[in-house]
UniProtKB/Swiss-Prot annotation:
Superkingdom field: Eukaryota
Gene: PLAC8L1
Signal peptide: none
Pfam name, any one: PLAC8
InterPro entries xrefs: PLAC_motif_containing (IPR006461)
Protein family membership: Belongs to the cornifelin family.
Species this chain originates from: Homo sapiens (Human)
Identification of the protein by name: PLAC8-like protein 1
Length: 177
């Protein structure tokens, strides 16, 4: 039986790739031989008993949305409710959309992507639990794009969210359970 046949039926624990002699390895430089011999003689690493802790700094930030539920605070065509948003939406709707993307922590290039306004509107509706459907959002964005951006901006301005920072005391001793 050849080498493959005799080693094929052995237990995987008995067979290590580092213990196999290969004729291809005989043409290696002395530096490579030294590296391979060190690997063959290397003792397996011990198990990790201490795992890294997420948020090792001890600080956690929690955003609490105070007002949720219901419908949109203003209608789609209620642009005159907030003059700043009205003028920004009229003269530079992309700037207003960049402001909304910044509010969500997205890149300022976000409004250049197709469907970004639709995603921002759905994100606002889902985050604040505003009643509505995807079909209504799609129609508002694709038929009344500038009005839709203004409505989302007004909603984000009217709905409040508070940011809390919680400090945790780090554990001093790790124990195995």
């Amino acid at each position: 039986m050849n080498w493959f046949g005799s080693n094929f039926f052995r237990c995987p624990e008995d067979l290590s790739l580092l213990n196999i002699y290969s004729p291809l390895l005989s043409h290696m430089s002395s530096e490579d031989e030294h590296f391979i011999s060190n690997l063959r003689g290397h003792v397996p690493a011990s198990a990790v008993v201490k795992q890294p802790v997420r948020g090792a700094s001890g600080r956690t930030t929690i955003t609490a949305i105070v007002q949720t539920g219901g419908g949109w605070s203003t209608g789609l065509f209620s642009v005159c409710r907030d003059r700043r948003i009205c003028f920004c939406g009229l003269f530079c709707p992309m700037c207003l959309e960049c402001d909304i993307a910044r509010h969500y922590g997205e890149c300022l290039c976000w409004p250049l992507l197709p469907g970004s306004t639709f995603a921002l509107r759905i994100g606002t509706r889902e985050r604040h639990k505003i009643q509505g459907t995807l079909c209504e959002d799609w129609l508002a964005v694709h038929c009344c794009w500038a009005f839709s951006i203004c409505q989302v901006a007004r909603e984000l301005k009217m709905r409040t969210s508070q940011v809390y920072e919680i400090c945790a005391v780090p554990m001093t001793k790790d124990t195995l359970v």
